[in-house]
Curated annotation (Swiss-Prot):
Active site: D7, E67, D140
Keyword Lyase: no
Protein name: Crossover junction endodeoxyribonuclease RuvC
Organism: Acetivibrio thermocellus (strain ATCC 27405 / DSM 1237 / JCM 9322 / NBRC 103400 / NCIMB 10682 / NRRL B-4536 / VPI 7372) (Clostridium thermocellum)
S-S bridge residues: none
Binding residues for Mg(2+) 1: D7, D140
Length: 162
């Protein structure tokens, strides 16, 4: 199964393509789509959309996993990131790919075994699970890979009827 993980944003959106077969994970590709802060929001969203569509068309994932947004203070940031999330979901929907959403706590629980794990713990586990030479940077990329691995774990449980 090929899974695309997305850590949504409009300045930086991380993505990770993971292959999951027989309890084995392989990193296929990962990176970030970035936009210039000098660009107007609609143009930034278009850059994000075009970048995601290109990646989706190249790898044709069977599922797309997106980290749900969680902001408790800065509503302006939440709204801006929400635009990026909407673009990611739209790109997936237009490609006919099912979208699965996971909270940060679910991702941490799946990757580390503890829902309140530190970001560095998640990054180290992503590196180990995918046998990567280094922790992917920026952080958004490691987060995208983590949500893809989280979906593989969840999909496995769903397929077993758990």
């Amino acid at each position: 199964m090929i899974i695309m993980g997305i850590d949504p944003g409009f300045a930086i959106a991380g993505y990770g393509i993971v292959k999951y077969e027989g309890n084995k994970f392989t990193s296929v590709d990962y990176g970030a789509i970035t936009t210039e802060s000098s660009m107007e929001l609609p143009k930034r969203l278009l850059v994000l959309y075009n970048g995601l569509k290109e990646i989706i068309e190249k790898y044709r994932p069977e599922a797309i996993a997106v980290e749900e947004l969680f902001f408790n203070k800065n509503i302006k940031t939440a709204l801006a990131v929400g635009h990026g999330r909407g673009v990611a979901v739209l790109a997936a929907a237009q490609s006919g790919i099912d979208v699965f959403e996971y909270t940060p706590i679910q991702v941490k629980q799946s990757i580390v075994g503890y829902g309140r794990a530190e970001k560095t713990q998640v990054q180290q586990m992503v590196k180990a699970i995918l046998n990567l030479p280094a922790i992917p940077k920026p952080d958004d990329v490691a987060d995208a890979l983590a949500v893809a691995v989280c979906h593989a774990h969840s999909y496995k449980m769903i397929s077993y009827g758990l």
